[in-house]
Amino acid sequence: MSTSSINGFSLSSLSPAKTSTKRTTLRPFVSASLNTSSSSSSSTFPSLIQDKPVFASSSPIITPVLREEMGKGYDEAIEELQKLLREKTELKATAAEKVEQITAQLGTTSSSDGIPKSEASERIKTGFLHFKKEKYDKNPALYGELAKGQSPPFMVFACSDSRVCPSHVLDFQPGEAFVVRNVANLVPPYDQAKYAGTGAAIEYAVLHLKVSNIVVIGHSACGGIKGLLSFPFDGTYSTDFIEEWVKIGLPAKAKVKAQHGDAPFAELCTHCEKEAVNASLGNLLTYPFVREGLVNKTLALKGGYYDFVKGSFELWGLEFGLSSTFSV
């Protein structure tokens, strides 16, 4: 058996201990394992520590403010103001100025039917209008082709963090990247029941869109990785979903703790942000259609790391080799 280590992975090729003079049939055999410490390697893929379900806390009871109550408060406020002005007539000029200011302010935040305008809705509207004018209308050929279908060369796993949109960081154009974003840019191992959403995305990208590259991109100051290193994972939970999700990165945490246990927490986070990318690359190998693409050399796996503090980007590849096993 020969083993090579690439970016924290041992890619092993198995061959028989003895040769045979009998007729043999060659078939490819691939083995990959993720190192969880500096001194030893595991022959199994990363697995979750706990298989017990996590029950969400009860939904909060929300009591809406009734219009009648709102009206009553308004009437009381007006009555109090009128009473104050009757008692202190010298305040009328000041009150008139204040009322004028309030009227002007309400005029900019309310529509004609009295419903408050949403700044978020306005931002979405103006954003789309800018996109339509500056990009969509100026690229009729591109969007005409995209109307017929998509054939992106990249599938990208990136973090949901609002600061690290891969389309902006890597200047992807529409139709270039099939993107999956989640907390800490994690790829879970193959599990048809538990991670069907991720599995469906990978299956669609590889088998139907025929992407030629899958790229997992980590980033600096990742809150998900900070949580991975901070949560005790002792059976108690302070979140409904986050702790269970970031458990996917536990092999990366174990390796970083073993190799850099005495480092400051911020440094541990940086190491783990990168090692979690390698763990996800290892998990991608548990998907049969990904392995098939690697065997056929129609697919490549890459890891990336974006440091938005320094303005730098690292890229590395997961090298994949084959040997042949013998069946008599």
From Swiss-Prot:
The protein's UniProt keywords, in alphabetical order, are: Chloroplast, Lyase, Plastid, Transit peptide, Zinc
EC number(s) from the headed UniProt entry: 4.2.1.1
Q: Which Gene3D superfamilies match?
A: Carbonic anhydrase
Q: Where is this region: Disordered?
A: 1-26
Its quaternary structure?
A: Homohexamer.
Q: Which residues form a coiled coil?
A: none
Its annotated function is as follows:
Reversible hydration of carbon dioxide.
- Record flagged with keyword Plastid: yes
Q: State the organism of origin.
A: Pisum sativum
Q: Name one Pfam family in it.
A: Pro_CA
Family of this protein: Belongs to the beta-class carbonic anhydrase family.
Q: Which domain of life is it from?
A: Eukaryota
Q: Where in the cell is it found?
A: Plastid, Chloroplast stroma
- Outcome of swapping residue 159 to S: 100% loss of activity
Single GO biological process annotation from the record: carbon utilization
Q: Where is the transit peptide?
A: 1-70
What's its catalytic activity?
hydrogencarbonate + H(+) = CO2 + H2O
**How the protein is affected by changing residue 222 to S?**
100% loss of activity
Biased region (Low complexity) positions are 1-15
Q: What is this protein called?
A: Carbonic anhydrase, chloroplastic
Question: Impact of changing residue 168 to N on the protein?
Answer: Small loss of activity
User: Mind naming one GO cellular-component term on file for this protein?
Assistant: chloroplast stroma
